């Protein structure tokens, strides 16, 4: 998701 940071452990890089 673009709403999640790419380095965020709770947000996949996708």
Swiss-Prot record:
Swiss-Prot/TrEMBL keywords: Acetylation, Activator, AIDS, Apoptosis, Host cytoplasm, Host nucleus, Host-virus interaction, Metal-binding, Methylation, Phosphoprotein, RNA-binding, Secreted, Transcription, Transcription regulation, Ubl conjugation, Zinc
Residue ranges annotated as motif Cell attachment site: 6-8
Primary residence: host cell
Modifications after synthesis and translation: Acetylation by EP300, CREBBP, GCN5L2/GCN5 and PCAF regulates the transactivation activity of Tat. In addition, the non-acetylated Tat's N-terminus can also interact with PCAF. Phosphorylated by EIF2AK2 on serine and threonine residues adjacent to the basic region important for TAR RNA binding and function. Phosphorylation of Tat by EIF2AK2 is dependent on the prior activation of EIF2AK2 by dsRNA.
GO cellular component: extracellular region; host cell cytoplasm; host cell nucleolus
Functional description taken from the UniProt entry: Transcriptional activator that increases RNA Pol II processivity, thereby increasing the level of full-length viral transcripts. Recognizes a hairpin structure at the 5'-LTR of the nascent viral mRNAs referred to as the transactivation responsive RNA element (TAR) and recruits the cyclin T1-CDK9 complex (P-TEFb complex) that will in turn hyperphosphorylate the RNA polymerase II to allow efficient elongation. The CDK9 component of P-TEFb and other Tat-activated kinases hyperphosphorylate the C-terminus of RNA Pol II that becomes stabilized and much more processive.
Domain topic, free-text comment: The transactivation domain mediates the interaction with CCNT1, GCN5L2, and MDM2.
Additional record remark: The Z-84 isolate was taken from a 54 year-old Zairean male. HIV-1 lineages are divided in three main groups, M (for Major), O (for Outlier), and N (for New, or Non-M, Non-O). The vast majority of strains found worldwide belong to the group M. Group O seems to be endemic to and largely confined to Cameroon and neighboring countries in West Central Africa, where these viruses represent a small minority of HIV-1 strains. The group N is represented by a limited number of isolates from Cameroonian persons. The group M is further subdivided in 9 clades or subtypes (A to D, F to H, J and K).
Protein name: Protein Tat
């Amino acid at each position: 998701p673009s709403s999640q940071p790419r380095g965020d452990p709770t947000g996949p890089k996708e």
